[in-house]
Each structure stands twice: as C-alpha cells, then as structure tokens.
C-alpha cells in the first residue's frame, strides 16, 4: 500500500490487472474491503466476429466450436480439441475457480449438475426433476447455490422466468443455458462433420 500511495503521489500511471481466479484469491487474503478502489471488468468469450477475423471461422464452426480462442488451433483434431475443452477449461474452472475458492460440500454433485445442464441446455428443468436425476442431491437450495457458482465461473446459467412479479421470478424453474456452445459439443460423440448432416440434431 505504501508503494501504491507513493506512485499515486508522484502521478505515476500504474494499473494492476488481476485476471481469472486470482482476483478471488486476493480478496480472501485481504483485511480491507478495497471499497471504491477497484473496478471489475467482465471479459467474456470471443464473439463470432472476433473468431472469424482471427481464424477465418464461419457461422457453423462458431456454433460447434464456440468462442475459446485457445482451442482454435486444435479443431482439425477433434478428439484432442474435446479433451482440451474438458480438461483445460471445464475441469480447471470447476476445480480451481470454484472448489478451491468457495466451500462446496458435494463437489461430485456440482459436476453432475453441470453435465445435466449441458444435456438440457436451452430447456426448462424444475429443481424437483433435477433432484430425481441427481443422486445425493440434497435439496433444491443446494442445487440453486451450486448453479450460481457455475454461472459465476462462466460455465452454466439458470435463467429465471421473466415476469413483473418478483416472487414468481424467484420461484420459477430455471432454464439451463451454457455460456459457450463448446461446453456442449465437447461432451458429444459426433464430430463437426457428422453433426452438420443430421438436421434433427443440428437444428
């Protein structure tokens, strides 16, 4: 803090950027709140235009492979690409960004909830039905809590029903929505070429 105050006094334009889970680790080790002294900037997945300009992708490729620039060089070897997404992105996000930084009593349940969310992405699924499909699920509050963690990690969201009645919104069944379509594709057995010739599956 002394060095920071000194740089500020000397009008030295210094900015410190914490990316990924490091911002959460910093908050855990602080005795101060840093109120008014930091700004959160959301850096989401790459858009179609960005992936098109950088790698020449078309719309179908973007729908299947998603907006992860780090995996773009692997799409010609889809088995390797799927392992990269599962191991380097999904597993790392759950194991490090969530499990190491927050208290999760049932990590296996959270992983199964994520897999279920990928399977039902774009669909509404009640918490009661989730309890029926997930072993040792506990209660709906636990599932809702874990779903919020997955949303914060940029993996899976549970979109609430849009209504002017706040009570009905809070009590509504969530609509699963993955943050990136690659999270679904990496769990499917089909390749990009195989899925695009199946109108029922491709949509």
Language-model features, listed with the residues they occupy:
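Conserved Walker B catalytic segment
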Residues: 1-17
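Surface-exposed charged/polar residues within alpha-helices that form helix-capping/stabilizing sites
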Residues: 2-5, 61, 115, 132
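Active-site catalytic pocket residues across diverse enzymes, especially alpha/beta-hydrolases
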Residues: 4-8, 30, 134
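Alpha/beta-hydrolase-fold catalytic nucleophile elbow
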Residues: 19-20, 179
């Amino acid at each position: 803090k002394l060095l920071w105050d000194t740089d500020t006094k000397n009008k030295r334009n210094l900015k410190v950027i914490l990316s990924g889970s490091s911002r959460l680790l910093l908050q855990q080790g602080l005795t101060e709140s840093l109120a008014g002294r930091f700004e959160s900037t959301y850096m989401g997945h790459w858009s179609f235009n960005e992936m098109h300009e950088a790698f020449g992708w078309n719309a179908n490729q973007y729908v299947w492979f998603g907006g992860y620039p780090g995996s773009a060089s692997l799409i010609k070897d889809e088995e390797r690409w799927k392992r990269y997404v599962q191991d380097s992105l999904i597993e790392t996000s759950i194991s490090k960004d969530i499990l190491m930084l927050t208290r999760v009593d049932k990590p296996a349940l959270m992983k199964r909830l994520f897999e279920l969310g990928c399977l039902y992405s774009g669909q509404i699924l009640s918490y009661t039905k989730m309890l029926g499909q997930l072993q040792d699920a506990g209660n709906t509050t636990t599932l809702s809590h874990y779903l919020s963690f997955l949303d914060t990690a940029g993996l899976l969201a549970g979109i609430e029903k849009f209504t002017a009645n706040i009570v009905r919104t809070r009590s509504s069944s969530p609509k699963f929505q993955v943050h990136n379509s690659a999270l679904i594709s990496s769990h499917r057995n089909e390749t990009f070429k195989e899925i695009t010739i199946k109108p029922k599956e491709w949509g």
